[in-house]
A protein has these predicted regions:
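A structure-centric signal for secondary-structure junctions around beta-strands
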Residues: 51-54, 104
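Long, amphipathic alpha-helical surface segments
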Residues: 1-52, 61-65, 71-88, 96-98, ...
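Amphipathic alpha-helical segments that form the core helices of the histone-fold
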Residues: 57-62, 108-112
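Short alpha-helical scaffolding segments that buttress acidic/His motifs in well-ordered protein cores
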Residues: 37, 103-112, 139-141
Length: 169
């Protein structure tokens, strides 16, 4: 295989596999929310360095990634479920109220992307805990920078998260 060839996977196929795995039924993120995350994370079976320089594989997985080691679609699906469950568990510690599904999905997508510590310390979570759903949603467009530099891909992602979030606000 050509070393410059990127081995990708189909997000839809990996999500279909994920739906059959243990842990899927424990997720609080909706199927649409999972698609939102997965569509912007993309899916790669070979590790790569993301815009922030972090080794990544599968659908946005940064845990236990071994540069040069190809994974399977089933491994990508399993790590995706594990990672979303981890994000949800961390958000449970800082989100103190019941949240409309679309707002929750958008928050999980943000936290999956920027980290749960950043999400939990955000104004978005502050507004969520005050049940100010629209105000919370409108915090999403602030998260469009990588190391201080505007990122058009993040801008697109946040616009889609905002649109989804507002449907529940």
């Amino acid at each position: 295989m050509n070393p410059s060839t990127v081995k990708c996977c189909l997000v839809g196929a990996v999500l279909a596999i994920a739906a059959t795995l243990p842990g899927f039924q424990q997720l609080h993120t909706s199927v649409e929310g999972l698609k939102l995350i997965a569509d912007y994370e993309g899916c790669r079976l070979q590790p790569y360095q993301c815009d922030a320089g972090v080794w990544t594989d599968g659908i946005g997985n940064t845990s236990g990634v071994v540069p040069g080691k190809t994974i399977t679609e089933r491994q990508a699906a399993g790590s995706f479920i594990t990672n979303v469950l981890r994000v949800e568990k961390a958000l449970d510690r800082c989100v103190l109220v019941s949240v409309p599904q679309n707002v929750y999905d958008a928050l999980v997508s943000l936290a999956f992307n920027v980290g749960t510590g950043n999400a939990c310390g955000s104004t978005m979570v502050k507004f969520i805990n005050q049940k100010r759903w629209r105000d919370a949603c409108y915090q999403l467009p602030r998260w469009v920078y990588v190391k201080g530099v505007f990122n058009p891909g993040l801008d697109n992602r946040r616009a889609r998260e905002l649109s989804w979030c507002l449907k529940g606000a």
